[in-house]
Amino acid sequence: MSRYTGPSWKQARRLGLSLTGTGKELARRNYVPGQHGPNNRSKLSEYGLQLAEKQKLRFSYGLGEKQFRNLFVQATKIKQGTLGFNFMLLLERRLDNVVYRLGLATTRRQARQFVNHGHILVDGKRVDIPSYRVEVGQVISVREKSIKVPAILEAVEATLGRPAFVSFDAEKLEGSLTRLPERDEINPEINEALVVEFYNKML
């Protein structure tokens, strides 16, 4: 399954979840596209609920199915902690996500573009791989040639707050993951147990 590249508002309404973090997609119509009103959502089967929850999480991070599933498999090899939360931590440690959490981009999709275009440094070295796994304490910064990119400056200015597990210096345009997040600090609307149940049946 390829990565979804269509309108984020349509996908957000289908999933009942804001994919940009702003909630704007659901502000006017928080029901499925094509549905005649908010009360006509059909009841899902157990499999349907698991699939829907998996899709919510996958689309939130903007990943294709193969990449998402492979990351889940990696999470199964971590011996400490719970599988669902370990999976979410791996998603959170992706470079594109950390760039987004730092407020260097307004969406994860934009953060991925910044990484792909070589605007982002990790410990002073350019990294253009969005899936790069960030370690606690590594410094994420903007390349000197990119510090005046309007979209980056606009994102920093528009960011009103950042998670407690990151630090950021707006003057230097750099920050870091200071610790791993707690479960209640990330995606509280997701029931990761349903995602685990879905993949346990598939793998």
From Swiss-Prot:
Q: Which GO terms describe its molecular function?
A: rRNA binding; structural constituent of ribosome
Tell me the subunit arrangement. Answer: Part of the 30S ribosomal subunit. Contacts protein S5. The interaction surface between S4 and S5 is involved in control of translational fidelity.
GO terms under cellular component:
small ribosomal subunit
Q: Name one Pfam family in it.
A: S4
Q: Give the originating organism.
A: Streptococcus suis (strain 05ZYH33)
Keyword Ribonucleoprotein on this protein? yes
Give the family per the record.
Belongs to the universal ribosomal protein uS4 family.
UniProt keywords (A-Z) are: Ribonucleoprotein, Ribosomal protein, RNA-binding, rRNA-binding
GO BP term (any one):
translation
Supply the gene name: rpsD
Q: Which domain of life is it from?
A: Bacteria
- Protein role: One of the primary rRNA binding proteins, it binds directly to 16S rRNA where it nucleates assembly of the body of the 30S subunit.
Against PROSITE patterns, the record matches this protein to:
RIBOSOMAL_S4 (PS00632), S4 (PS50889)
Residues covered by the S4 RNA-binding domain: 93-156
Q: What is this protein called?
A: Small ribosomal subunit protein uS4
